[in-house]
UniProtKB/Swiss-Prot annotation:
Gene giving rise to this polypeptide: prfC
Function (record text): Increases the formation of ribosomal termination complexes and stimulates activities of RF-1 and RF-2. It binds guanine nucleotides and has strong preference for UGA stop codons. It may interact directly with the ribosome. The stimulation of RF-1 and RF-2 is significantly reduced by GTP and GDP, but not by GMP.
Residue ranges constituting the tr-type G domain according to the UniProt record: 28-297
Natural source organism: Synechococcus elongatus (strain ATCC 33912 / PCC 7942 / FACHB-805)
UniProt name for this protein: Peptide chain release factor 3
Record localization: Cytoplasm
A biological process from GO: regulation of translational termination
Protein family according to the UniProt entry: Belongs to the TRAFAC class translation factor GTPase superfamily. Classic translation factor GTPase family. PrfC subfamily.
Matching HAMAP family: Rel_fac_3
Length: 556
């Protein structure tokens, strides 16, 4: 017997290949995506309707629901329920047909984009949700740029077609012209506003006519007719039918051809139309998404690209959340599984510290609800109890040492000193600030002047600062004061402290240090920034800073 034959017949080899086969089968069934949108585009509504069709919930509850209705499944923090907006990212896993779908629900409110940036690091696909009356909006553009940095596939869903909106062809043109992204309409709307009659599915050449379900709470009844069915003339007004025919001919004649490779490269976006509130087009979108979306794939690490069927387990932390259950004062690390098979009670290595950890109480997350998890595969997200060990971007693994690329910090736009007026509350104040910093609720910076000890909160929007104050008071019993600072732009100095010292005094800017002690310059406006960039290119100012892998944050 040759060496190759001997190895192939050995129990160890069979065990590895059986495990790889099991992982490959699980990966084939996995789809993972995040929804990016501007506030009020209907993100929470679409999320709930996807869960409704996936059987994960029996009844969808509007976000700003009446008291008799349920609160939205994906909004669980008390402040979110009060305001009717999503502030933190949550993870929702559900099954549809033979697929397991991991929906990384991100905040749609404009003040919470940094949490969204981090969530996009764990997503394989993004769904760009747009209001058909408004088209592209500023928040969506920002998030699109983050998707482009990672070259992930983007699926577009134009929502609120049952309300007056812009012309569909005009909306496609806007995406192509402003984002440089080619479009392919997978389905096409029949009318709009109060004359919205449904959609035409170009994949199967079928017309889907929808009846509104009661407030969209239940799955919509779907009447499906083949294109060319004589009944269409009785069910759709002649002018709408003619308009549909003309627009379809135009799409076939001058529209982009379908190209799955271009979709996977993030160069072509499949486009869908519907109304999440009334369930129009939601299931059609879901079925096409499962066919077209990228399955969990290889991810770049310190030892090269890691394929998902690599038999050793690995994953990275993309989010931390404290006090998901205020009764237990818990802290949860959200881990995206990248390779291998995760199993309850397994022992892993923590790359940054080198410590060995036993993962004894892993959890499957569904908004605020959790259940103990026995196993998970690439593309899944698991919740781990976090006794202060994990930081955003951390890698855990079995087998040979590896580390995944860090999750970058993005430039904040609002800055304020956080003051603790009550000296007797110093310990809970420090603990609260430290835990909220670890969680990534806000960036924490400090003055380069060591005499100024108060932390500087750095956020992408005012509401983020309010959330920190709210949580410090409600979860740690500490009342705080904010002292706004007159800056709106931050840039990391890639050249480091040495280069900064050689440059000497800089006008119209203030120097601070970030969580890892790296120099950051704060500017009052873009004009001041451009002036310093022109005068001192050696500073190498950056708007995005990588997570400082392997470094411990400085003490609060």
């Amino acid at each position: 017997m040759g060496v190759h034959s001997f190895l192939c017949s050995s129990p160890w080899f069979r065990m590895v290949t059986d495990l790889q086969k099991e992982i490959q089968e699980a990966v084939q069934q996995r789809r993972n995506f995040a929804i990016i949108s501007h506030p009020d585009a209907g993100k929470t509504t679409l999320t709930e309707k996807l869960l409704l069709y996936g059987g994960a919930i029996q009844e969808a509850g509007a976000v700003k629901a009446k008291r008799s209705q349920r609160a939205a499944t994906s909004d669980w923090m008390e402040l979110e329920k009060q305001r009717g907006i999503s502030i933190t990212s949550t993870v929702l896993q559900f099954n549809y047909h033979d697929c397991t779908i991991n929906l990384l629900d991100t905040p749609g409110h404009q003040d919470f984009s940094e949490d969204t940036y981090r969530t996009l690091a764990a997503a394989d696909n993004a769904v760009m949700l747009e209001d058909a009356a408004k088209g592209l909006e500023p928040q969506t553009r920002k998030l699109f740029e983050v998707c482009r940095m990672r070259n992930i596939p983007i699926f577009t869903f134009f929502n609120k077609m049952d309300r007056p909106g812009r012309e569909p062809l005009e909306l496609l043109d806007e995406i192509e012209q402003e984002l440089g992204l080619q479009t392919y309409a997978v389905n096409w709307p029949i009318g709009s506003g109060d004359r919205f009659r449904g959609v035409f599915d170009r994949r199967k050449q079928q017309v889907h006519l929808f009846e509104r379900s009661v407030h969209g709470k239940r799955q919509a009844k779907d009447t499906t007719l083949e294109w060319g069915d004589p009944q269409l003339a009785d069910l759709i007004e002649p002018d709408l039918l003619q308009q549909l025919q003309d627009e379809l001919e135009l799409l076939e004649g001058v529209g982009t051809e379908f190209d799955l490779e271009a979709i996977h490269a993030g160069q072509l976006t499949p486009v869908f139309w519907g109304s999440a509130m009334t369930n129009f087009g939601v299931e059609l979108f879901l079925e096409a998404f499962l066919d077209y979306a990228l399955k969990p794939g290889a991810r770049r690490s310190s030892v090269g690209d890691m394929a998902p069927d690599y038999p050793e387990f690995s994953g990275f932390v993309f989010k931390l959340q404290a006090n998901m259950d205020p009764r237990h004062r818990d802290r949860i690390a959200f881990v995206r599984v990248c390779t291998g098979k995760f199993e309850k009670d397994m022992t892993v290595q923590h790359a940054r510290s080198g410590r060995t950890l036993r993962l004894s109480r892993p959890q499957k997350l569904f908004g605020q609800d959790r259940e103990v998890l026995d196993d998970a595969y690439p593309g899944d997200v698991i919740g781990l109890n976090n006794p202060g060990m994990f930081a955003i971007g951390d890698t855990i693994y079995t087998g040979k040492r590896l580390e995944y690329d860090g999750i970058p910090c993005f430039s904040p736009e609002i800055f304020a000193y956080l003051r603790n007026p009550n000296p007797s509350k110093f310990k809970p104040f420090r603990k609260g600030v430290s835990e909220l910093r670890e969680e990534g609720a806000v960036q924490i910076m400090y003055s380069a002047d060591s005499a100024k000890r108060d932390p500087i909160l750095a956020a992408v929007g005012q509401l983020q600062l309010e959330v920190v104050q709210y949580r410090l008071e409600n979860e740690y019993g500490v009342e705080t004061l904010l002292e706004p600072l007159p800056f709106s732009v931050a840039r990391w100095v890639e050249g480091g402290w040495d280069v900064l010292e050689k440059v000497g005094r800089l006008f119209n800017t203030t120097t601070v240090k970030d969580t890892w002690g790296r120099p950051v310059l704060l500017f009052k406006n873009e004009w001041n920034l451009r002036q310093i960039e022109a005068d001192h290119p050696e500073l190498q100012l950056r708007s995005v800073a990588p997570v400082a892998a392997g470094q411990e944050p400085i003490e609060v």
